[in-house]
Amino acid sequence: LYFAQGIPYVVAMSVSVIMYKRMGISNTDIALYTSWLYLPWVIKPLWSPLVDLFRTKRLWIVTTQFLIGALLASVALTIPLPKFFQYTIAILWLMAFSSATHDIAADGFYMLGLEQHQQAAFVGVRSTFYRIAMISGQGVLVVLAGLIEGASGLPPRELQVVSKPDAPPVAVALPGTLDVVSSDGPLEIVAEPAILEIGTVAQSKQEIDSILAKVKRTNLSNGFYPAEQSPGEKSSRQLSRPTGGSVERLEEFLRAHFGPKEKASIDRAGNIGVVTLHLSRPPEPGRKVAVVLDRASGDASIRLVEGMRLVFDDGNWNKPALAVFQIDPTLKTEEQAVFRATSGNVRLAWSVTFFVLAAIFITAFVYHYFILPYPAADAPRSGGTSGRFLTEFFRVFAAFFAKKRIVVAVAFLLLYRLAEAQLVKLISPFLLDAREAGGLGLTTARVGIAYGTFGVAALMGGGLLGGYVISRQGLKFWLWPMIIIINLGGWVYLFLAYVQPQSFPLICAAVALEQFGYGFGFTAYMLYMILIAEGEHKTAHYALCTGFMALGMMLPGMFSGWLQELIGYQHFFIWVLLTTIPGMVVAAMLKIDPEFGRKKAEAAKR
């Protein structure tokens, strides 16, 4: 059930971004329109009373699963159309509303179908399967689309990029024209050189930026891709930075009293190399050949920074299409990566992928239609006239805010993860930033190993263990240990910021410890939301709790990056530790039944 809950979310948030990028949609349009897909999950508490008042949660679950499957099939059918972007965005938006409604019903069904101690025992399993869905969506679906794409179109062309520590810096020459003779053989992609060697000596950032700008202008003038950003568009930093005279005075105060003693100046960038691509002969008139460059294997510290998608036709087939590869400035050893240039049928690949997704959801619909139980408590709570419905609708909201000690409960929801909400935004930048800037200077590949492998495994383990121990001794017994453990992350990263260890296994262990603590401690938070939602309208009230949960994560994360830039990593992690205090103060005011969450057999022994 929770695997099915996670798939639509990852489709809307991640998979759609990759799909549109592969189809040549500009970054500006992707960022703007896919951001709107998040809206239904933000505002879902507004219609949660409808799910609680009308029909059963079981019916809502199977109906929305069927609807999601139909909408995913609709996406697959509209991808080949000329205006696919407009059609698919509209359908995905409807899918997002259906998925948010499915979330409301699934959470309510979980609380109605399980005893209190079972809810505690399975809360870790629930979150684990949700995360498995996230991993499957971001991995398996994208791999499937890539395999189909690679099996169609022109034969793929592989490029090998190698970092060479002993290679001297070489000036990058950009060809203006190519002397290409049309081949009588089959249409193929030609890449020169087939093996690109890049020295590991960092170059001037200004020089690298200048070359990248020239490459983009060349590709634009030769018609290989459209401009993605207007010259007057503001950077994300300009848009996100707080403004105003009082804010500037606050910045000056923080920088003067809490900022790092000396701001590191980072004026070096990873070295780059250029590969030229063209076709072996002109394609048929009117045919466009979209060549997509992507990593096939190798070290993630070598990346493609320009020329991801190049469109050839009979007018530019023999002009130089330029692809730029860059190595991580922290990379000092010989590594290699293989990139593959493919020209498969991108739309066909993603159509098939979405048909597979649709089949998965139709299968889930059939499975849950026959397998899901019929809890006696799962019954509609409203009937009669529209006037009575409106009365019930507003009564649901009123009942939530009329609960005993609701102010303390809401404060706990907002403050429990105040420290973690700030920390999670800066973990990856801290791991990646140069040591001169206060970070750990890891390569992209190593961050993926530390955070994406060891961290995820520890997170799942913490969630499973947290659910188990609460089912044995109850939420009240484990609340304070979980509060302490979830806030270990601040101490972990404070240690890393001051010591800046060179040992990669030590860094991996520290990241795993922080993620384990987060998974273990978050179990208490989820159980407390279930406790607050107890009562007549638990489905709608749980949805309201998740709304406050989202707010508690969103607001602190908005200013955390701004604050870190002012005071540096060391003082930022000290600040994170200080922000654990409000949550602890509110936690001391909570009134929790000692038996809540405890398995009945365990409670009977006492």
Regions found by a protein language model. Give the residues of each.
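Helix-loop boundary and gating motifs at the non-cytosolic
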Residues: L1-W41, V407-F412, Y416-E436
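C-terminal ends and interior cores of transmembrane alpha-helices
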Residues: V62, F66-K83, I484-Q502
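Intracellular juxtamembrane helix-capping segments at the cytosolic ends
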Residues: S16, T101-L114, F520-E534
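Intracellular loop-helix junctions on the cytosolic face of multi-pass helical membrane proteins
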Residues: I79, K83, Y87, E115-T128, ...
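Helix-to-loop junctions at the C-terminal end of transmembrane segments
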Residues: V42-T56, G461-W480, Q564-E565
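A late C-terminal transmembrane helix in Major Facilitator Superfamily
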Residues: A133, I532-L566
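Loop-to-transmembrane helix entry
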Residues: I25-L39, L348-A349, R435-A458, P505-L506, ...
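C-terminal transmembrane helical hairpin of 12-TM major facilitator-type secondary transporters
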Residues: F477-Y525
